[in-house]
């Protein structure tokens, strides 16, 4: 099983080819292909390649699937014995990306064809 740990949207993610992930909103169009080059670790067969801080020559190719909004988070602030109450909600803007491949040292790591989703409906049913 090939995987990589990347840094995207100021967060670290464990990504595998053929899977989709929700990142903080990226400025990209739908079906646009992006290359993420902040790869901290790559694991294929054998020992993992660990970067200091990034693995040289390693990239992750992703495709933008959609721009959803996250679940609502309710913030409720109250002062006891006073009539001070404040209720706020927040929904984070997200970008759903599909990891197409991981490239390290000229070697391209992709998912098996059986593991990839067949359609957009399969992606929505899985997540």
From Swiss-Prot:
GO terms for cellular component: cytoplasm; ribonucleoprotein complex; ribosome. Transmembrane segments: none annotated. One of its GO terms (biological process) is translation. One of its GO terms (molecular function) is rRNA binding. SUPFAM superfamilies: L21p-like. This protein binds to 23S rRNA in the presence of protein L20. This is Large ribosomal subunit protein bL21. It comes from Synechococcus sp. (strain ATCC 27144 / PCC 6301 / SAUG 1402/1). The gene is rplU.
